Amino acid sequence: MTTSASPRPGRVLDPAKRAAILEGARAVFMREGFAQGSMDAVAIEAGVGKQTIYRHFRSKEALVHALVEAMCAPEVLQPLRSSLPAPERLRELLLTLAAGVAGPDSVRLYRAIVAEADRMPGLGRLFWEAGPRQVRAVIAQLWAEDHDAATAPIIAEQLVHLALGDAYQELVLGTGSPGPEIFERQIDAALALVELTPRARGPSASGPRSTITV
């Protein structure tokens, strides 16, 4: 089955209807899951005919892929446009990341992708490339501004895991509802921890260190 979200050649499609379809798909699939959510339900939610959906998206799988890409749009990268020093931008980025992934729809999206891992294996890769991989690359870039660039990729991976920590697992598993203050504490602890690692700081570890308030 093709997963291309491109319309058939020769058709001029209304971008407003495409946006409405994606919003309808978001509501249906986040409520019912990818397997149980139907195209009929998406059409009703979006206020369009089912044939209109298929003019924009060749299949249900193509619609699911387009929705995942849209929901992984890198809004978390907003702090990069700030004029703050790199350490503060890094902290802001991690706070934005935590707030984003802890949102109800983000948690539902992650659960839905895991649930479909066997049936739609490409979905996990799409999610990874559209979201987590980009975030880690930007964290590595920020870290490298003041630290050893060679360690930046592994530091970025560890910072994400430490910043989200057990609080995110509780959200995904439905065993708790940690608030933003929990994530903020985890983030500050994570930043303090990596700053204590001389190798992560690189050859200039004995010199002035970046100032991050913990």
Question: PLM features: residue spans?
Answer:
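Amphipathic alpha-helical linker/stalk segments
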Residues: R31, H65-L94, A99-V101
